[in-house]
Design a protein with these regions (language model features):
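Mid-domain alpha/beta scaffold segments of enzyme catalytic cores
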Residues: 1-219
Length: 219
């Protein structure tokens, strides 16, 4: 049976039809399977805690190589929340370095900062996959991101043309994030938008997951 892959969620499940990647903060206990990172929202703590950056990076490094952790993130830049851009960019770059050192993909949080994300990608030339979660922008921006090797994960709200582009280029992921929707229902909705059978969508994303991390094969 081909499972449903939920690449980014804040809801843990024991459903055997679903393989979900639970997002955890750097200071939370890891579970299998999970992503661990320093969310841009948390960077605001650096404004009042001079040790926040060094401490959070150290804690993330300690967890990053664990078998339960299959990705680093959420990491990224948020122009509306968190610390100033200089602090956010420093913490983002440090997390990119960690992802590269442990050879694991990066889950990206991006709010009104696509140009900055692309700039970091071009400057650092990372070898590990980058997945931008919660993608809602248009096809033109999707084409720009995919052109720079950034994959896209779609929640409940998405641009259909961007979705189709991501599917056709094998850069598509699906997620529930903080939403209460069942990932199976989400797959059904997306398959309908793509005008394909849901089993075809499941198989495509599962094959991508198997290439992303062998951990998906061990579940």
């Amino acid at each position: 049976m081909v499972p449903y892959i939920d690449i980014h969620t804040h809801h843990q499940t024991t459903d055997k039809e679903i393989i979900s990647v639970l997002n955890r903060s750097f200071d939370e206990e890891v579970v299998s399977l999970c992503s661990v990172g320093i969310h841009p929202y948390l960077t605001v703590k650096a404004q009042t805690d001079q040790d926040f950056i060094s401490r959070s990076i150290r804690m993330l490094k300690d967890k990053a190589s664990m078998n339960e952790v299959i990705a680093i993130g959420e990491a990224g830049i948020d122009a509306l929340k968190g610390a100033g851009m200089d602090v956010q960019e420093e913490i983002f770059r440090r997390q990119i370095e960690i992802a590269e050192s442990v050879k694991k993909p990066l889950i990206i949080h991006c709010v009104k900062s696509i140009d900055e994300i692309i700039r970091q990608k071009k400057e650092l030339c990372p070898k590990q996959p980058w997945i931008m979660h919660g993608y809602r922008k248009n096809e033109q921006t999707a084409r720009q991101l995919i052109g720079h090797g950034i994959e896209l994960s779609f929640g409940q709200r998405y641009n259909t043309q961007a979705l189709r582009l991501a599917y056709s280029t094998s850069r598509i992921w699906l997620e529930t994030d903080e939403d209460s929707i069942d990932i199976r229902e989400h797959y059904q909705n997306v398959a309908q938008a793509l005008n394909i059978p849901v089993d075809e969508l499941k198989l495509k994303i599962y094959k991508q997951a198997a290439q992303l991390s062998s951990a998906f094969l061990r579940v």
